[in-house]
């Protein structure tokens, strides 16, 4: 019997390394997006494994941020330093033992509980070529939004601690599907 091979990687999108939140969003969603920062269109037309892409907003976020280009261009505009950290990128693998029909509800629940409920915006995409590597990409704003839809200052490690300061465990979301 094969053993599940978990993969969960968190990185920061950094302008100082030539990275772009708009490019990351274009890559994971398969959409053609124009970057106002460098005046270039970002498009990765070789991405054939896209299953689903969605943006999850907190209730008080401006509705215009449901548009991927608007959201990530706004993020890049507010992060205006040459060495700005633009977004948090998470890539996580789905265990192949979990039925594909559960991927969407699992990732939405995870994003809602861990990020959107804390005021962050989550842009996620599920990829699956059908070759045993189903995974999700999540692009997160580093700043949460206040109740008026304005960006708050960045908060360190908001993604890995719950309201009691305890470490968040992914098993809470995935465990029922694995049993």
Regions found by a protein language model. Give the residues of each.
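N-terminal nicking endonuclease/strand-transfer module with a His-rich metal-binding environment
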Residues: 1-179
């Amino acid at each position: 019997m094969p053993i599940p091979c978990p993969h969960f990687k968190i990185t920061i999108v950094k302008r100082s390394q030539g990275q772009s939140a708009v490019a990351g969003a274009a890559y994971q969603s398969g959409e053609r997006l124009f970057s106002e920062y460098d005046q270039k269109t970002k498009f990765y037309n070789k991405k054939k494994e896209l299953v689903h892409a969605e943006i999850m907003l907190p209730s008080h976020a401006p509705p215009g941020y449901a548009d991927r280009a608007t959201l990530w261009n706004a993020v890049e505009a507010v992060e205006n330093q040459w060495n700005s950290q633009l977004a948090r990128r998470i890539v996580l693998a789905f265990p192949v033992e979990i039925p594909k029909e559960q991927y969407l509800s699992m990732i939405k629940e995870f994003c809602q509980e861990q990020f959107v409920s804390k005021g962050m915006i989550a842009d996620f995409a599920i990829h699956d070529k059908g070759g045993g590597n189903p995974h999700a990409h999540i692009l997160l704003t580093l700043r949460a939004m206040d109740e008026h839809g304005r960006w708050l200052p960045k908060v360190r490690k908001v993604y890995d601690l719950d309201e009691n300061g305890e470490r968040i465990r992914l098993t809470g979301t995935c465990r029922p599907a694995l049993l």
